[in-house]
From Swiss-Prot:
Belongs to the alpha-IPM synthase/homocitrate synthase family. LeuA type 1 subfamily. It comes from Crocosphaera subtropica (strain ATCC 51142 / BH68). This is 2-isopropylmalate synthase. Its main location: cytoplasm. GO terms for cellular component: cytoplasm.
Length: 537
C-alpha cells in the first residue's frame, strides 16, 4: 500500500473522540443518526467508538457496523488499547461491518511511559508487534497510533512505527494528543517519519490533533504537504478540552485552495478533481445535527458553519457582495448546503408533502417517527403561518432525536408579571407511569419551571448553561433552547424547540434530566470491576 494516494482520506472521530467533550454523551440511537449523516456526508472512515469502554459503546459500534457499515457505506472503525481484551472487544463489535478497521494505540512519550504506563521502551517495542498481529486476526485493516507522538523521542518513535508496519499495520497515525506542536514542527515530524521509517511506503500516514493552541487545522494542512494522507477530525471540531481538528474547516480549505494543494498530491496545479470524497453540500446539515444532539452550540463566528460565516455588516462589504459575491466571499454558501431556495409548508400541507420535503432534506425516519413528526408539524402549523426548512429541522430534532422518554412533560403553566412572583405548575409522567404535579416560585418564569420540575424528579443537579435562539425571523418564530446540567461531575445536555419559549425550556430541561436519569440507571448495570474508560488519544 502506498502512502501517496492522490486524494485525502477523511477519518471522522465525532462518535469517539468528539463524544468525549463534557456533556456530549449520546444514546445509541443518536449515534446511529449521526453515523447515517456521516455516511451521507461521504466520510471514508467512521470511528464509531471504544467497544471495551462500556456495554453502551460496544452496542453502538456493533449497531453502526450492522446498519451503516454496508458494502456502499464507509469503513467502520473501533478503538482499542494495545491489550488483547480491548482488541477482542473491538473485533467482535465490528463483525457485522462489510469493511472494518481496528485502531490500536499505546503511548510512546517518556512522560507517558514513566507516569501512566510504567513501562520501559523495550517493553513497548515488544507489545506493539504482538498486539498489531493480534488485531490482524480480526481484520486486514489495522491502524496503529503512538500516543503523544508530538512529545515522543523521534528515534524511538521511528522504531515503534517500523515495528508496527512490519507486524501488519496498514495505517500509522501520528497524534498531537495535547495540541502542543506548531505547524512547522508538525510538518517536520511527518517528514522525519517519511525519511527515517524504512517501510513507511507500506502504510498510510494519518494525523490526529487537538486544538489546545488553536493550531490543529493548520498543523494538519502542513502535515498533508509533508506526506500525511489521512486526516482524523470531528464535526464542528468537538472533542476533549479545546476540541479536535474541525472536519468542515479541513474539507473546505482543501476545496477552496485546491490549486495550492494539488501539487503536494502529485496532481496538475489546475486539476479540478475534488481532493476528498466529501459531499460538501451536506456539511451545514451535519453540523446542525451534531450540535443539536450533543448540546454543543456552534459559536456564531465559527469558520464555515457559524451563523455569521456568510454575514456582512460593513456597508462597503455589503455593497461589494451585492454586486459580486466573490468580492468578499471566498466560497459560496450553497457549497456547504446553505440555500435561500426554501419550500414553505403550511397548515394545509399534507403528509405526503411533509414526507417528500423531509426526504429532500436528507432525514431518514421510520413510519412511527414520521407519524410523530407529522403530528408535531401540524401542531406548529396551527400556531405559525409558514413552516420553513429550518422549522422542519427543528421539529424533527425536537420530536424524534431525543433521549429515551423516562420522564414526560404533561403540563406546564406559568403566572408572572411586574408585581407578582413568577410561579410555575408542572405535571410530569414518571418512568413508573404515575402523574405527579408540583409548583414553585422562582426569580423568573423559567427558573420557576425548573424548580417545580426538580421538586418532582428529585435528582440533584446544577444548571450550568442555558441558551435560547430563534430558528427563523418573525414574531411567530420557533425558539430553540439548549441547556447543560452537571450531576456528580458529569454534564448532560438537553434540546427542545417550540413557538412557546417557556414550553421549549421545560422540554429541554426534561430532555437533559432523562439523559441524567438514564445514565444513573446504566451505571447500576456496569460491574464495579469494569469501569467506564475514555481514551486520551
Amino acid at each position: 500500500m502506498s502512502n501517496q494516494p492522490d486524494h485525502i482520506i477523511i477519518f471522522d472521530t465525532t462518535l469517539r473522540d468528539g463524544e468525549q467533550s463534557p456533556g456530549a454523551s449520546l444514546t445509541v440511537e443518536e449515534k446511529l443518526t449521526i453515523a447515517r449523516a456521516l455516511a451521507r456526508l461521504g466520510v471514508d472512515i467512521i470511528e464509531a467508538g471504544f467497544p471495551y469502554a462500556s456495554p453502551g459503546d460496544f452496542e453502538a459500534v456493533q449497531k453502526i457496523a450492522k446498519t451503516v457499515g454496508n458494502e456502499s457505506g464507509p469503513r467502520i472503525c473501533g478503538l482499542a488499547r494495545a491489550t488483547k481484551n480491548d482488541i477482542k472487544a473491538a473485533g467482535e463489535a465490528l463483525k457485522p461491518a462489510f469493511k472494518s478497521r481496528i485502531h490500536t494505540f499505546i503511548a510512546t512519550s517518556d512522560i507517558h511511559l514513566k507516569h501512566k504506563l510504567k513501562k520501559t521502551r523495550q517493553e513497548v517495542l515488544a507489545i506493539v508487534p504482538e498486539m498489531v498481529a493480534y488485531a490482524k486476526t480480526f481484520t486486514d485493516d489495522v491502524e496503529f497510533s503512538p500516543e503523544d507522538a508530538g512529545r515522543s523521542d523521534p528515534e524511538f518513535m521511528y522504531q515503534v512505527l517500523e515495528t508496527a508496519i512490519a507486524a501488519g499495520a496498514t495505517t500509522v497515525n501520528i497524534p498531537d494528543t495535547v495540541g502542543y506542536t506548531t505547524p512547522s514542527e508538525f510538518g517536520a515530524l511527518i517528514k522525519g517519519i517519511k525519511d527515517n521509517v524504512p517501510n513507511i511506503d507500506q502504510a498510510i500516514i494519518s494525523v490526529h490533533g487537538h486544538d489546545d493552541l488553536g493550531l490543529a487545522v493548520a498543523n494538519f494542512l502542513e502535515a498533508l504537504k509533508n506526506g500525511a494522507r489521512q486526516l482524523e477530525c470531528t464535526i464542528n471540531g468537538i472533542g476533549e478540552r479545546a476540541g479536535n481538528a474541525a472536519l468542515e474547516e479541513l474539507v473546505m480549505a482543501l476545496h477552496v485552495r485546491r490549486q495550492y494543494f494539488n501539487p503536494f498530491l502529485g496532481r496538475p496545479v489546475d486539476s479540478m478533481e475534488p481532493l476528498t470524497n466529501i459531499n460538501t453540500k451536506e456539511i451545514y446539515k451535519t453540523s446542525r445535527l451534531v450540535s443539536n444532539l450533543t448540546g454543543m452550540i456552534v459559536q456564531p463566528n465559527k469558520a464555515i458553519v457559524g451563523a455569521n460565516a456568510f454575514a456582512h455588516e460593513s456597508g462597503i462589504h455589503q455593497d461589494g457582495v451585492l454586486k459580486n459575491k466573490l468580492t468578499y466571499e471566498i466560497m459560496d454558501a450553497e457549497s456547504i448546503g446553505l440555500t435561500n431556495n426554501q419550500i414553505v409548508l403550511g397548515k394545509l400541507s399534507g403528509r405526503n408533502a411533509f414526507r417528500t420535503r423531509l426526504d429532500e432534506l436528507g432525514f431518514e425516519l421510520s413510519e412511527r417517527d414520521l407519524n410523530n413528526a407529522f403530528l408535531r408539524f401540524k401542531e406548529v402549523a396551527d400556531k405559525k403561518k409558514e413552516i420553513t426548512d429550518w422549522d422542519l429541522e427543528a421539529i424533527v430534532n425536537d420530536e424524534i432525536q431525543q433521549a429515551p422518554e423516562l420522564f414526560r412533560l404533561e403540563l406546564v403553566q406559568v403566572s408572572c408579571g411586574d408585581h407578582s412572583a413568577p410561579t410555575a405548575t408542572v405535571t410530569l409522567r414518571t418512568p413508573e407511569g404515575k402523574e405527579l404535579t408540583d409548583a414553585a416560585i422562582g426569580t423568573g418564569p423559567v427558573d420557576a419551571v425548573y424548580k417545580a420540575i426538580n421538586r418532582v424528579v428529585n435528582v440533584p443537579n446544577e444548571l450550568i448553561e442555558f441558551s435560547v435562539k430563534s430558528v427563523t425571523a418573525g414574531i411567530d418564530a420557533m425558539g430553540e433552547v439548549t441547556i447543560r446540567l452537571r450531576h456528580e461531575g458529569r454534564i448532560y445536555s438537553g434540546y427542545a424547540a417550540n413557538t412557546d419559549i417557556i414550553t421549549a425550556s421545560a422540554r429541554a430541561y426534561i430532555s437533559a434530566l432523562n439523559r441524567l436519569y438514564g445514565a444513573i440507571q446504566e451505571q447500576t448495570k456496569v460491574h464495579p470491576s469494569e469501569p467506564v474508560l475514555t481514551s486520551k488519544n
